[in-house]
Amino acid sequence: MKAKERGIETHLVVLTDGSRGGNSSDLVETRNREVKQASGMLGFKSLHCWSEPDRFLDPTEDIIEKASGVIQDLLPSTVFFPGPVEIHPDHRAAALLVWKALQKIRCKEFTPEPISYEIGVQNPANMLIDITTQSRGKDAVMQIYASQNKENNYPELVAALDKGRTFSLPKEVKFAEGFFRYQTKDLGLSFDEMTHLVIDL
């Protein structure tokens, strides 16, 4: 939301079809509508839905090549991906996939800055961003995902995660998000090696 406020161009790739996030017969179509509505609120310039099978995301060479191609087409200054210790298997697979895609283009003329973000649990973080003024807007976007919110109280859980990130921040900061800002030279390591290095710090 801060990116939208500052006029920064952003793009979103949704990797899986969301088919296992409930029992509704039209769940895939519903989740597609939800993500399109949320993307509109967040101001993404483009939305890419790849429809890989939910909970079975596999970072094969083909999908890594596809991700690498999108990155080279968009030429972003930064690529965001889920943190390495997320609970959902697709989130962890997405992190590995993006890392390998960035490794593929590391020797080319540009390399985006890799930054991981938190979804459901605290991950290694070396950057905290105050989202106090964006928290209501973030909650409004999360409320769009009615198909998922009826399965669990995700907006409350995410708000709790954001509240927890204020532990070391000034008291006027009510909500914050945690990120890990990697250096491009880190791409010389495998994702497993880099994760162990980060956790051992």
Q: Where does each model-flagged region fall?
A:
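Conserved strand-to-helix beginnings and helix N-cap segments that scaffold or border functional pockets
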Residues: 25, 60-64, 91-95, 128, ...
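Active-site environment of divalent metal-dependent phosphoester hydrolases
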Residues: 19-22, 55, 85-91, 122-124, ...
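Active-site rim/loop-helix segments in enzyme catalytic domains that contact anionic ligands
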Residues: 1-74, 99, 103-109, 140, ...
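Proline-aspartate-enriched helix->loop->beta-strand connector
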Residues: 44, 67-86, 91-94
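Helix-loop-strand module that forms the ligand-binding subsite of alpha/beta enzymes
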Residues: 83-109, 115-123
